[in-house]
């Protein structure tokens, strides 16, 4: 995608602030599930993803940091945390899942949603007081947005993403798709 934007209005990965909410569009894990289940009703999410370009434009003036989820939420959120020099806490039970994925064991559904990639939904951060306005904007585009976590002050030399399931630590086996290994 190539385009123009007003000077100084780009939403980068590095603008998140401690306390910002972590929000995603749509449902996560659909493309990864379809890759492993070719006859799934989710196949179109793999074959013909719908990039959220129009909503990304709406987020100018609201989001403090943003990127698309191409490598899996765990890895892509890590990019925001690193660029912003913050930690992140992600609440597994808040992940927006298609009903097909909701039928899976929580650890399997989380693996698809967090490490699968190719969803091309948006992951963005914003101050909590802007959430109602963003939800209203999303509703006008008939798009779901879900708060999945919060940005935290960095506690160590390296940034980290903490995964929690019902406020208990959650161990993720794979963090995302690697394009060039």
Question: What are the language-model segments listed below?
Answer:
Residues 18-26, 49-73, 77:
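Internal active-site segments that recognize and position negatively charged phosphoryl groups
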Residues 1-34, 150:
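Glycine-rich anion-binding loops of enzyme active sites
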Residues 34-35, 69:
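Short, surface-exposed recognition loops or helix-turn segments adjacent to catalytic cores
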Residues 1-12, 41-58:
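Active-site glycine-rich loop that binds ribose-phosphate moieties when present
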């Amino acid at each position: 995608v190539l385009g123009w934007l007003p000077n100084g209005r780009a939403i980068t990965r590095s603008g998140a602030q401690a306390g910002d909410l972590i929000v995603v569009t749509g449902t996560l894990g659909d493309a990864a599930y379809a890759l492993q289940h070719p006859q799934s009703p989710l196949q179109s999410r793999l074959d013909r993803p719908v990039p959220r370009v129009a909503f990304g434009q709406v987020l100018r003036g609201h989001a403090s940091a943003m990127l698309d989820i191409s490598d899996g939420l765990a890895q892509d959120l890590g990019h925001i945390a690193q660029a912003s020099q913050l930690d992140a806490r992600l609440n597994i039970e808040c992940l927006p899942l298609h009903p097909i994925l909701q039928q899976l064991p929580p650890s399997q559904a989380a693996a698809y949603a967090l490490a699968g990639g190719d969803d091309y939904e948006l992951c963005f951060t914003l101050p909590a007081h802007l959430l109602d306005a963003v939800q209203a904007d999303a509703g006008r585009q008939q798009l779901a947005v879900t708060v999945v976590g919060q940005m935290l002050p960095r506690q160590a030399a390296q940034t980290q993403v903490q995964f929690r399931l019902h406020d208990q630590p959650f161990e993720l086996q794979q963090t995302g798709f690697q394009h060039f290994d």
